[in-house]
Regions:
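Short, low-complexity disordered leader/linker segments with a strong preference
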Residues: 1-29, 85-86, 107-112, 332-337
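Hinge/cleft segment of the Venus flytrap/periplasmic-binding protein
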Residues: 26-28, 37, 128, 133, ...
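Extracytoplasmic "Venus flytrap"
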Residues: 29-57, 66-80, 87-89, 95-100, ...
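Short, solvent-exposed amphipathic alpha-helices that sit
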Residues: 41-56, 156-163, 191-210, 225, ...
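Short beta-strand elements in bilobed, periplasmic/extracellular small-molecule ligand-binding domains
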Residues: 56-70, 205-223
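Hydrophobic alpha-helical segments within soluble ligand-binding/sensing domains
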Residues: 77, 136, 147-178, 226-227, ...
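Hydrophobic alpha-helical
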Residues: 81-82, 91-111, 116, 195, ...
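Flexible loop/hinge segments that line or gate small-molecule binding clefts
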Residues: 105-155, 278-286, 291
């Protein structure tokens, strides 16, 4: 009897070992195209994507990430999407170069039955006459394996305006009854840039303020360009400039250099606001060198994007849109970080 039990136990152990040995590790291939690596915010975003995917790996499931820099070139990004198809990606995460042409990229994924998660730059839709509609590209809404993860840029613009309204003189530094500002915009085709430009000023007019736009220029999210545009505006308009609105913190940091070079003092004779809450911007707010910024939550957004990508890999149902809220960052908030 003891001998029989011993044989049975040995068989169980052998079978168990065979089962363990035969268990295969499933590796999913994830293609990730970022519109431009030099963008400060998207650098934080893509690094967090990589880090978060790593935390989700198990003994049975691994993720092979293939990152690609589109270099702000639509043709380059289209090639990357086609390469992802050739490489047999199981899911694609896409940060589109041109939101107005995202349908081309969406169609590549859909026609090849590859799940697609668009991030950060919301695709646009147009009517038959080419007029922009206030909704995203219908290819997202009409496909169960395509979604967008981002934040409502109208909220970020509104928060910028509210940061100005929260100052002691509500933005009217010289007391002439109007708020005179310059606007440094990101990519004019980007819906986030459009909404931040519109709603930052709308927050002021909705509060009953009279505004005057002294200058509005395109900085394409670039810090050096932001410095150049702000310097030019300060040279032309001098102390008439009371507020500098920047569509992102990269350009705001450039504007800060121009402001300091011109001998102006943020909080005394000029205000400066951005968006993203980059570490250097938050530090500038702590020091009083920036009026405020708006937290564009790269951690929340990147985690949401990865989570929905994993859901798609599992064949689970998803929503077409996932929104992550912005947060106002003033001196008190910055000091608490």
């Amino acid at each position: 009897m003891k001998k029989t039990l011993a044989i049975l136990m040995a068989l169980v152990m052998v079978l168990g070992a065979c089962t363990f040995a035969s268990a295969e590790v499933k590796t999913y291939k994830v293609g990730i195209s970022i519109y431009q690596y030099t963008d400060n915010f998207m650098t934080l975003y893509r690094n967090e994507i990589a880090a978060y995917f790593k935390t989700l790996e198990t003994d049975e499931v691994k993720y092979e990430l293939v990152f690609a820099d589109a270099k702000n070139d639509m043709a380059e990004q289209t090639n990357q999407m086609n390469n992802f198809v050739t490489q047999g990606m199981d899911v694609i995460i896409l940060n589109p170069v041109q939101t107005s042409s995202a349908d081309v990229l969406i169609d590549i994924a859909v026609s090849n039955e590859i799940p697609l998660v668009l991030i950060n730059r919301e695709p646009l839709a147009y009517d038959a006459d080419g007029n922009t509609l206030d909704e995203a590209y219908e290819g997202i809404l009409n496909n169960p394996k395509v979604c967008y993860v981002g934040a409502d840029a109208r909220q970020s613009g509104t928060y910028q305006g509210e940061l100005i309204l929260a100052t002691a003189n509500q933005g009217d530094i010289n007391g002439d009854g109007k708020i005179s500002y310059i606007m440094i915009q990101g990519d004019p085709e980007n819906i986030d840039a459009q909404y931040r430009t519109e709603f930052s000023v709308k927050a002021l007019t909705d509060a009953g303020k009279t505004v005057e736009c002294l200058d509005s220029q395109v900085g394409n999210w670039d810090q050096t360009k932001g410095q150049e545009l702000c310097a030019n505006a300060l040279t032309v308009h001098g102390y008439d400039v009371e507020v500098v609105f920047c569509n992102n913190d990269g350009m705001a940091m450039g504007a800060l250099t121009a402001i300091q070079t011109a001998g102006r003092i943020v909080g005394e004779d000029i205000y400066l606001v951005g968006v993203d809450a980059l570490p250097e911007a938050v530090e500038a707010i702590k020091l009083g060198d920036m009026t405020g910024t708006v937290l564009n939550d790269h951690i929340g957004q990147s985690h949401a994007a990865v989570d929905v990508a994993v859901q798609l890999l599992k064949g689970e149902e998803i929503q077409n849109y996932y929104w992550v809220n912005y947060v106002k960052v003033d001196k008190a908030y910055a000091a608490a970080q």
